[in-house]
């Protein structure tokens, strides 16, 4: 009975462990199925299971075979010794015969199963993707320059073969070594001499010899397998000058690998003969030969050739291989698709050219993202638990104008709740989502130096139809790290509203239903009984898991790499995240490695869209020609939709990804040089242009801009970055030599253009402009005056703006009090052109000082939503709220009468300004060119409606 009870307890424990493990799998299955991607759950799971079974079976064969062979060899050895000592004649007289019976066999099988499937369980999860890509490989249609194999062989097949080799060679080597050591200690192998090439050096019985012969034969077979594929791995070589196979690799290492392959073949033959013939040297001599040959052939030989032949004539010997590295690296990073154009950079900017470039000037980014984030937090945080994670740049057509917009979602920060409010009910049932977004125009600043909001407040309000939000709730974002339960008996907190709080219920379709069985499995998975004890949970309740959008997509498709900067867009009233996903490889031949991400091939093949409200995820194939994506589409049919399935309204918001652009810019520093001689001599290496951050120089980050490219008629959204020559401590060069632009609108999406400054033209780089700003006596005096105790000066990012064959440099200056909770205010704008630098209160004034012309830059677009129109959110107001609103607006207001009265006042002010201007001219004898015409002040004082909803006149100042 006791034995039966123990067995039952053991079985119960095993069952409990399996049940706990399966609870996690069950939760994953429910989650994948809820999103409609069950094949992303089943395909990897089944693949891993099959691989583990195959891997475990093969390892079991090796281990069990070895253990049984060791047992047989030792028993044979001991029985022979005992028979001699006891003088037993009959062959059936075996003193240790009983040891070979059932109990030992059972224990050997148990040990073999535990070791083999234990190792398989640990390693079997890692190789599933290599197996599936091997079975579904897509050719690149281009061969490598050495072995002429399709490039897909190196991306798909070779990693699979290397995985197989690594999975079995190590365990085989260990088993062989363990067997030799065990036989030696057991006395089965007796070394008569260390000179193992002699005939009588080793004494071994026949059973042990046959066992070792079999192990060594298989080991040589695998080593030969490895040597063969090592020849192709030479195209990843990092020895010598070239990344990839160089002269020494192909003329020394490759022959050495072929020689080792021959030795392995001889080892296989020798092992086979030793199995039948009592000659130990058939085993020892091949082992000795290969141990001596590996360091001599693979190490010393290439080193000698490199030193004596290659280095004295390095350029001559390595030129064809340098060309291979340049060509394939450029292909791997998409640099071969960059079109190059000359950018003269010496064309004078006139009033006519500036007038033509108004669309570009109207979108100059004056609001710097870093101070803007603080401003959003202080002005639009509303409550301490609302946080803005970062600022997203995008563009919208607003009232017929193409405008750059800076936008940040208002997410819920659980750690900023009062400690006493961080209860289970609040964290899981009550506070479930963020609310709305804040947006402002990139170039619009109020007279107080604050951003002009395009979307603001809670609930979100806007004057623009294109930015109307009908569903502002953010259940899935960048700061939503924990699960929540929705549709409980407890209403969810929606947003703060007066003395009370607005409440809501989740109406999305996603979420796992909390059925009794699901609650049981989730309780086991999360180690809590609250799924049963909480009275708020009912039959309609759902649990929302993996709400962080990056965790969400990485769990769905871990075989893709993702951009670090997802961005939110307003799409037909809903908030949607767009995440750039990459297909990558680190086994692309002859391609230089990008170390920060361990890759040497990358394509932005996929755009992922996540709905911020219900968490639905869609994968769209934007580069359907990419062979890696084509392979994934074979493995996971139906997961990746065609780009044509993406709504047109979303396609207009697709951006060229910043991470990919950084990678390409980094690689372009060297690989813009396509001539092997120039590349070898490093004659024209570049650096990313630098700017000052505090007092230290740092690389300029790529930035989005709406501008008109050279030879283009219309403004468009581009991502750009400037380059300067490479510098060192002895030779510091910071002039600009080129700038790279990525187009992203319409049919031009993804086009890369490299604009090169002629070598005989000297153009200031950003760091030079920063130095000139510091050296300007008036500017430096004013900044030093402000940057005293009680306040601090914040210098925004320096924006380099290519403009009509020249460059304009713009840097906003912010002033912030040192008091807690203070808001950075933009007080000045520094603009540089040629050898001139000015600092003014506004961008318009700075341009007027530089060029003597006052341009009529567009303010924020006029409102196109009636102030009396019902917003989408107002339909959700409670009856009492509606009554209050009605009472407040009982008295009718005629906007036209108000506007006419204001226009009369503006006209009076205009007359006063004209009189002052005439007096000024009489005193100075100077003339002011106002757009070259008579109606400068009229243009400068056009009436506009600002984002705050009030009517104001644009303040403009005359250039003294």
From Swiss-Prot:
UniProt topology in membrane = Multi-pass membrane protein
Q: Which residues does the annotated region (Disordered) include?
A: 866-899, 924-960
Record keywords: Cell membrane, Membrane, Transmembrane, Transmembrane helix
Record's subcellular location: Cell membrane
Q: Where is the composition biased (Basic and acidic residues)?
A: 931-944
Q: Which Pfam families match?
A: UPF0182
One Gene Ontology CC term in the entry: plasma membrane
Q: Where is the composition biased (Acidic residues)?
A: 881-897
Membrane-spanning parts? 7-27, 50-70, 105-125, 169-189, 212-232, 256-276, 285-305
Could you tell me where the Polar residues compositional bias lies? 950-960
Main subcellular localization, coarse class? Answer: membrane
The protein's superkingdom reads: Bacteria
As for family, the record states: Belongs to the UPF0182 family.
Record-linked PANTHER family = UPF0182 PROTEIN SLL1060 (PTHR39344:SF1)
Q: What is this protein called?
A: UPF0182 protein DSY1630
Lineage per the UniProt record: Bacteria, Bacillati, Bacillota, Clostridia, Eubacteriales
């Amino acid at each position: 009975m006791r034995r039966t009870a123990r067995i039952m307890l053991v079985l119960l424990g095993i069952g409990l462990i399996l049940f706990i493990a399966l609870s996690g799998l069950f939760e994953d299955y429910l989650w994948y199925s809820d999103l409609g991607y069950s094949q992303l759950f089943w395909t990897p799971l089944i693949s891993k299971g099959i691989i583990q079974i195959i891997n475990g079976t093969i390892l079991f064969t090796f281990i069990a075979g070895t253990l049984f062979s060791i047992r047989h060899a030792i028993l044979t050895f001991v029985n022979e010794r005992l028979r001699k000592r006891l003088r037993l004649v009959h062959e059936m007289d075996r003193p240790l015969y009983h040891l070979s019976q059932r109990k030992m066999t059972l224990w050997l099988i148990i040990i073999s199963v535990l070791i083999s499937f234990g190792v398989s369980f640990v390693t079997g999860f890692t190789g599933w993707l290599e197996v599936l890509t091997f079975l579904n490989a897509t050719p690149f249609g281009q061969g490598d320059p050495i072995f002429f194999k399709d490039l897909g062989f190196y991306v798909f097949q070779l990693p699979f073969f290397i995985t197989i080799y690594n999975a079995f060679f190590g365990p085989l080597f260990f088993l062989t070594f363990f067997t030799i050591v065990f036989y030696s200690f057991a006395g089965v192998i007796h070394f008569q001499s260390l000179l193992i090439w002699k005939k009588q050096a080793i004494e071994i019985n026949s059973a042990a010899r046959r066992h070792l012969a079999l192990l060594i034969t298989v080991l040589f077979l695998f080593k030969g397998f490895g040597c063969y594929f090592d020849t192709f791995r030479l195209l990843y070589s990092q020895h010598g000058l070239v990344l990839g196979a160089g002269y020494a690799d192909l003329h020394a290492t490759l022959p050495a690998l072929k020689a080792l392959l021959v030795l392995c073949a001889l080892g296989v033959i020798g092992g086979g003969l030793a199995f039948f013939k009592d000659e130990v040297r058939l085993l020892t001599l091949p082992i000795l030969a290969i141990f001596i040959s590996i360091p001599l052939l693979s190490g010393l030989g290439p080193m000698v050739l490199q030193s004596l032949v290659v280095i004295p004539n390095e350029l001559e010997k390595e030129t064809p291989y340098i060309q291979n590295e340049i060509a394939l690296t450029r292909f791997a990073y998409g640099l071969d698709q960059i079109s190059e154009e000359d950018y003269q950079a010496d064309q004078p900017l006139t009033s006519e050219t500036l007038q033509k470039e108004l669309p570009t000037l109207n979108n100059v980014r004056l609001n710097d993202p870093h101070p803007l984030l603080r401003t959003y937090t202080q002005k639009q945080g509303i409550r301490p638990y609302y946080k803005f994670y970062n600022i997203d740049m995008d563009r919208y057509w607003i009232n017929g104008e193409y405008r750059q917009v800076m936008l940040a979602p208002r997410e819920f920060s659980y750690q900023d709740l009062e400690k006493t409010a961080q209860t289970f009910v609040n964290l899981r049932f009550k506070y479930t989502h963020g609310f709305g977004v804040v947006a402002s125009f990139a170039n619009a600043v109020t007279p107080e130096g604050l951003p002009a909001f395009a979307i603001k407040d809670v609930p979100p309000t806007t004057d623009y139809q294109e930015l109307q939000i009908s569903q502002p709730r953010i259940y899935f974002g960048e700061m939503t790290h924990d699960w929540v339960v929705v549709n409980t008996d407890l209403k969810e907190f929606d947003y703060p509203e007066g003395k009370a709080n607005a409440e809501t219920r989740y109406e999305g379709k996603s979420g796992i239903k909390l059925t009794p069985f699901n609650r049981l499995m989730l309780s086991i998975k999360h180690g809590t009984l609250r799924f049963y004890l909480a009275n708020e949970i009912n039959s309609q309740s759902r649990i929302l898991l993996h709400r962080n959008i990056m965790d969400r997509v990485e769990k769905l498709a871990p075989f893709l790499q993702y951009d670090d900067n997802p961005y939110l867009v307003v799409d037909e009233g809903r908030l949607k995240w767009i995440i750039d996903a990459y297909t990558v490889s680190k086994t692309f031949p002859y391609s230089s490695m990008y170390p920060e991400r361990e890759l040497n091939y990358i394509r932005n093949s996929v755009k992922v869209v996540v709905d911020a409200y219900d968490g639905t995820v869609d994968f769209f194939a934007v580069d359907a020609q990419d062979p890696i994506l084509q392979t994934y589409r074979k493995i996971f049919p139906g997961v990746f939709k065609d780009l044509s399935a993406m709504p047109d309204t979303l396609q207009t918001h697709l951006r060229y990804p910043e991470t990919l652009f950084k990678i390409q810019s980094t690689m372009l520093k060297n690989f813009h040089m396509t001539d092997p001689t120039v590349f070898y001599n490093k004659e024209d290496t570049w650096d990313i242009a630098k700017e000052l951050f505090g007092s230290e120089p740092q690389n300029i980050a790529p930035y989005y801009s709406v501008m008109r490219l050279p030879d283009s008629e219309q403004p468009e959204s581009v991502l750009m970055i400037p380059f300067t020559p490479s510098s060192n401590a002895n030779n510091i060069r910071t002039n600009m030599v080129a700038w790279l632009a990525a187009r992203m609108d319409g049919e031009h999406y993804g086009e890369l253009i490299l604009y090169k400054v002629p070598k005989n033209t000297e153009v200031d780089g950003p760091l030079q402009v920063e130095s000139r700003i510091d050296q300007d006596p008036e500017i430096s005096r004013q900044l030093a005056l402000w940057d005293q105790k009680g306040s601090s000066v914040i210098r925004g990012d320096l924006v380099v703006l290519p403009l009509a064959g020249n460059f304009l440099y713009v840097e906003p200056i912010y002033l912030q009090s040192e008091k807690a909770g203070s808001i950075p205010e933009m007080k000045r704008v520094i603009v540089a052109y040629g050898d001139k630098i000015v600092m003014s209160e506004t961008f318009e004034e700075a341009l007027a000082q530089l060029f003597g012309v006052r341009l009529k830059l567009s303010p924020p677009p006029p409102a196109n939503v009636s102030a009396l129109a019902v917003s989408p959110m107002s339909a959700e107001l409670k009856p009492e709220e509606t009554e209050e609103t009605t009472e407040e607006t009982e008295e009718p207001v005629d906007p036209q009468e108000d506007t006419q009265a204001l226009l009369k006042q503006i006209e009076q002010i205009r007359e006063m300004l004209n009189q002052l201007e005439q007096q000024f001219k009489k005193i100075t004898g100077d003339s002011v060119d106002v757009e070259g015409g008579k109606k400068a002040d009229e243009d400068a004082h056009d009436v506009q409606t600002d984002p705050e909803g009030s009517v104001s006149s644009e303040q403009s100042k005359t250039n003294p």
